[in-house]
């Protein structure tokens, strides 16, 4: 399991530390299974973390009320935006592009990406992630203009049915595609990032392979031995 191997390689305390940097207020336990999502995290905490990715490494606190005025238009309350740089923009760009592969037909191999059921619904580029437990399903996705999360479960915390696993994915995809804007929806490539065509099975360069993004100097510069 790649997530767990990476978690153990980096040190179990690093996941907890990163959670705090991303404003996840729920304490993440420092054990091996935390990499698989065994810590229960609420929607606000999830949104806190993914907002930072959607905002290219800068965190903005999620809020419900933007402004309150009286009948004379005097401002009684107004939310104050305070952006905080949390992550390096270059690495966030790489991660955001990786999260577009969750619904990419090109990534079908020994198994299918987890969001293939919504691939045909999407008419723009989004970074999307989904998750599930015995008691709930969730899907979260974004571009540079919008972030939306959908959760489904039972009020009594009863187990959910496997046949309902696509519910949050479909609600998310059908709703997000109704939101239109004239603004550019995907991110500009930051300085210091380059693209390379690779064989995803080996990570080596392959002409007409899958395009992945790298920090300059780390891209593969050797030919995939399995290339045609």
Indicate residue ranges for each PLM-predicted region.
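Active-site-adjacent helix/loop patches that line small-molecule binding or acyl-intermediate pockets
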Residues: 1-55, 98-101
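A penicillin-recognizing enzyme superfamily signal
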Residues: 42-48, 52-227
């Amino acid at each position: 399991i790649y997530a767990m191997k990476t978690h153990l390689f980096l040190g179990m305390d690093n996941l907890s530390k990163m959670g705090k940097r991303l404003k996840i207020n729920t304490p993440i336990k420092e054990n091996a299974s935390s990499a698989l999502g065994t810590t229960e995290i609420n929607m606000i905490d999830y949104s806190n973390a993914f907002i930072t990715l959607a905002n290219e490494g800068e965190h903005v606190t999620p809020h419900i009320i933007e402004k309150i005025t009286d009948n004379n238009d005097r401002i009684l309350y107004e939310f104050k935006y305070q952006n905080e740089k949390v992550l390096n923009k270059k690495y966030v760009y790489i991660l955001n592009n990786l999260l577009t592969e969750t619904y990419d037909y090109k990534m079908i191999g020994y198994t299918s990406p987890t969001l293939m059921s919504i691939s045909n619904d999407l008419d723009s580029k989004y970074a999307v992630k989904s998750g599930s437990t015995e008691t709930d399903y969730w899907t979260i996705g974004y571009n540079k203009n919008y972030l939306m999360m959908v959760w489904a479960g039972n009020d009594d915390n009863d187990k959910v049915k496997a046949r309902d696993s696509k519910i949050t994915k479909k609600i998310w995809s059908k709703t997000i595609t109704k939101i239109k804007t004239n603004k550019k929806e995907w991110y500009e490539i930051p300085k210091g990032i380059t693209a390379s065509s690779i064989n995803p099975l080996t990570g080596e360069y392959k002409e007409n392979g899958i395009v992945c993004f790298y920090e300059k100097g780390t891209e593969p510069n050797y030919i995939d031995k399995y290339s045609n």
